[in-house]
Every structure is written in C-alpha cells, then in structure tokens.
C-alpha cells in the first residue's frame, strides 16, 4: 500500500551511522509501490532545518568511477525509514530518468564524497583520465596492456623487477596475487586508489596493511597470525584454513566493517574485532553459534549460509539485541522452538530465510508475519530433500523462479551422469585425458541443449554450472587440470 504521506519535493534527513553526521535526500517521483529519491549535498553534524533548504543542491558524485553525476534511485515506499526527519519541501530541479532500483540512502554517497576530497588530486585526476582510455594500450613489463586496466594478476606482477613500472597504470584499483613480493605492500601504501587486494596462500605470519588505502581485502593462508587493517577498510574476507592464533587489528575494532568467513571444517577463531557490526559465515557444515554473541555483541547484521549444513544453538541469536538483519540459507538442524521470537530482537528489520527445515520455516513465517518491515521465507525443505541434495551443487535451482522445474531435474541428471563418468575415468590406472575432455565437452553441450528453447541460464546459473564441474574435479582428484578444463567448457558453451 502506498504511503500517502510522501510528497514530491519533500526533503528528509537521516543520520549516517559510522561517522554520525546528518545527510539529506529529496523525493522527486512517486509510483504505486516505489519512489525516486536524489541525494542532496547536505553533510553536517547538525540536523538540517527548513531554513537550510535554500542552500541544498543535488549532490554531484565524483568518487570512484562517478563522473559529476547525481545519484537517483527507486526505493520501496513500504520500507521508507520511519526515523527519517522531514525537513520541508522545495521545488525539484531537472533530473535524468531513473533506471536504478535499490534501498533508501544511508549516507554512503556523502561520506565517500568527503573522503575523496582529501585524496591527492594528482592521483585522482590520473585515475579518472585512465579509466576513459578504453581503446588505448601501453607497454608494461614487456606486454601490451590497456591503459584503463583496473586489475593486475600474478603474470604481470611477476614480470617486473621494479613495481614503479606500474606507475604507467594510474587506473589500477585491484591486485590479485598468490605470491609474496616485498614490493607489494609499499606499492599499495603509495597508491591511494588501489582499493582491493585478493591474496591467496599468503604465507606471512604478520600482514601489516595499516598504511594502505584498501577498502576490500580477501585473504587465505593458514600461517597468518596477525592482520593489521587500515582505517579505510570496509570488507574483509577470510577463506580456507585459519590459524587458531589469528588476531585482526582494526582502528575501529570492526565497527561498521563486514567480516566474511568461508569456514574450513567449521572453525572460526576468536580474531578480536569486539565492535564488529556485520558478520557473514559461509560454507557451514555443522556450526555452533554459542560463542557469537559474546564475541560480537554489537552485531547489526548476521548472515549464515550452509554448504548445506547444520546450525546449532540458534536460540543464542536472541542475545544479539542490536541485530537489524538476519539471513539464513541452506541450514538445518533447528526447530521453530530454537528460533528467536520477534520480541527477543527489538531492532530486527530484515529477515531473509531460504532453504531451511519445512516445519520450522512454516512456524517462523507465522511468528514474524506483520511484525517486521522486510521479511521472506522461501524454499522450505523436507528431511528427504536434504538427504537427496546434500552434495547436489545445483540444489539452489530447486524452487527458483528463474529455473523451470523440468530444466532443474534434467540439469541435475546431467551433472550426476557427468560425475559418474568422471569418477569412472579417474579410477583407471592411467588417466586418458582425451576422455576427460570429451566428458567436459558433453557437459557444456548438454547445457547448450537444455538452454536452447527456453533460455534460463543467466549469470548466476552460469557460475553454478562451472562450480558444479569444479566440484567434480575436486572429488576425482583432477583439480590440477581445472584451468584447462574450465576454459574448454567456456569455449564450447552457448549459454
């Protein structure tokens, strides 16, 4: 139902949670279920008053890849923030047609605008210019690369003796590596617009990133015992086996930071970060939540995803009194009696549950219906379904609105037959690699046929198909051929 209190031209203010400053936005278009807002250039420690309206304009964004553009977005009227303060109403200015759909603003655009104003202007201008050089190339490390290249990988990183060679590439924003180079961290420290680092198999005991400008870091390596993060960090992802001694140091002790952990054998070390606000655990097989509230009492977001798997002591979530968002996917082993009641989570606004026990899901649905702002319970599973699909990498397609039921069953049958053939081939004393390639081609062509008449394979399904074959390679001990086989499937596919 439309919230009739919203009017075109209305200006509202909210307080950004990390820094605490106030920002403003204007309603410029209203539809049946959604409204368009535009961010304004107000950013202050003071709550705006009506006499501040004549000083406000549309916020022009120039951070990251923005180029003097306004940020307008369709957002659901039913989720309009109830704590927003109405400042007043002013005439709207001309704006471009809005094609973006998302959530109501949280002050991130104003915050990033202020941060980028403090960066070295020469690096920002060079970065912006480089990102426009779509067709120009340059020789770096003896290789021809595009001037607007955003990411570097091991092949290029290993080809230079001096990282100053990469000063020819001011548009860089991401480094992906599996090797340790003593020049890497100093390079990241002086390049303030390289915001992402992916480091697999890091073998350092201590990783000091405190003087870098990184926003997103993804790390794997069981030798790491200390990670020191910069003040710019927003997302840290840990993958693979972790040291029980691992400690993570952050200037804000994890406040307003996302910590993602892809669990290995369900082990989550106590890494510190006592003020962490956003925790997301994936690849859960059998995990107990008993320690989570004591370690991270200030969580506002908790995301839990199984492999699928079992989750224990779900009732402990009731101790997270500041929790605003809870997501659970592919998790079993709990009942409705274990699940927190609405009154136990006073700040909860968003509850997204998918692929959970059918009996528990039905009761949770009744408990929360009409009690919170944003709520969905999907793909309720029986015990029989879990037993049949525990190792099925395409199980998420079952019940998907984008994958027809018949296509799902045929896809699973194709995957199972591919797995059977690969297991048989891998059991031979001598591997016939030509036979392995034939199986991979049949796999790709099988999905070509399934997708031919009713195209259902999009980006997410495509990734699932590749991941499903990678699972077969891992199971059969043929993961060393992954790159070549995946490339072959990529060449033969039409989806």
Q: What are the functions of these language-model segments?
A:
Residues 9-10, 42-45, 49, 128-136, ...:
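Mature N-terminal, pre-catalytic/accessory segment of carbohydrate-active enzymes
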Residues 29-53:
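Basic/aromatic-rich interaction segments and small domains that mediate binding to polyanionic partners
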Residues 2-16:
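Short coil-to-beta transition motif at edge beta-strands of beta-rich domains
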Residues 47-124:
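Intrinsically disordered, low-complexity, charged/polar segments
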Residues 20-31:
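Short beta-strand-centered aromatic/proline hotspots
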Residues 132-184, 189-206, 211-226, 230-362, ...:
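Concave beta-strand-loop units of leucine-rich repeat
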Residues 9, 339-451, 462-464:
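C-terminal capping region of solenoid repeat domains
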Residues 379, 455-495:
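Amphipathic alpha-helical binding modules
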């Amino acid at each position: 139902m439309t919230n009739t209190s919203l009017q075109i031209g209305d200006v509202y203010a909210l307080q950004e949670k990390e820094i605490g400053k106030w920002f403003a936005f204007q309603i410029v278009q209203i539809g049946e279920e959604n409204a368009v807002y535009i961010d304004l250039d107000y950013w202050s420690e003071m709550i705006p008053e009506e006499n501040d309206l004549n000083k406000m304009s549309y916020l022009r964004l120039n951070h990251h890849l923005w180029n003097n553009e306004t940020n307008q977005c369709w957002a659901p009227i039913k989720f309009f923030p109830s704590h927003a303060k109405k400042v007043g109403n002013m005439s709207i200015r001309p704006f471009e047609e809005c094609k973006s759909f998302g959530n109501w603003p949280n002050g991130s655009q104003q915050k990033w605008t202020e941060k980028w104003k403090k960066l070295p202007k020469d690096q920002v201008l060079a970065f912006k210019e480089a990102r426009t050089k779509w067709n120009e190339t340059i020789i770096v490390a003896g290789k021809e690369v595009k001037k607007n290249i955003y990411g570097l990988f091991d092949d290029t990183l290993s080809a230079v003796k001096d990282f100053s060679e990469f000063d020819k590439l001011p548009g860089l924003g991401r480094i992906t590596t599996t090797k340790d180079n003593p020049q890497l961290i100093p390079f990241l420290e002086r390049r303030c617009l390289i915001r992402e680092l992916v480091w697999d198999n890091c073998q350092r005991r201590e990783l000091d990133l405190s003087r870098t400008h990184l926003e997103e870091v993804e790390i794997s390596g069981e030798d790491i015992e200390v990670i020191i993060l910069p003040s710019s960090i927003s997302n840290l992802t840990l993958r693979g086996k972790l040291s029980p001694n691992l400690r993570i140091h952050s200037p804000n002790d994890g406040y307003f930071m996302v910590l993602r952990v892809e669990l290995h054998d369900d082990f989550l070390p106590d890494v510190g970060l006592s003020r962490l606000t956003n925790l997301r655990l994936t690849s859960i097989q059998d995990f107990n939540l008993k320690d989570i509230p004591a370690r991270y009492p200030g969580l506002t977001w908790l995301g839990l995803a199984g492999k699928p798997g079992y989750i224990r002591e779900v009732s402990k979530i009731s101790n997270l009194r500041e929790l605003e968002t809870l997501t659970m996917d592919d998790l079993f082993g709990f009942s409705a009696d274990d699940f927190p009641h609405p009154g136990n989570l006073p700040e909860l606004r968003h509850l997204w549950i998918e692929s959970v026990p059918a009996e528990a899901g039905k009761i949770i649905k009744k408990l929360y219906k009409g009690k919170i702002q944003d709520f969905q319970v999907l793909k309720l599973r029986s015990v029989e379904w879990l037993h049949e699909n525990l190792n099925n990498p395409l199980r998420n397609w079952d019940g998907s609105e984008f994958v027809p039921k018949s296509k799902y069953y045929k896809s699973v049958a194709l995957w199972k037959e591919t797995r059977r053939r690969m297991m048989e081939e891998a059991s031979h004393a001598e591997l016939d690699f030509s036979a392995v390639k034939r199986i991979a081609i049949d796999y790709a062509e099988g999905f070509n046929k399934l997708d031919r008449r009713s195209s259902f394979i999009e980006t997410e399904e495509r990734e699932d198909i590749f991941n499903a074959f990678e699972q077969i390679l891992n199971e059969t001990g043929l993961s060393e051929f992954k790159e070549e086989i995946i490339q072959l499937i990529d060449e033969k596919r039409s989806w």
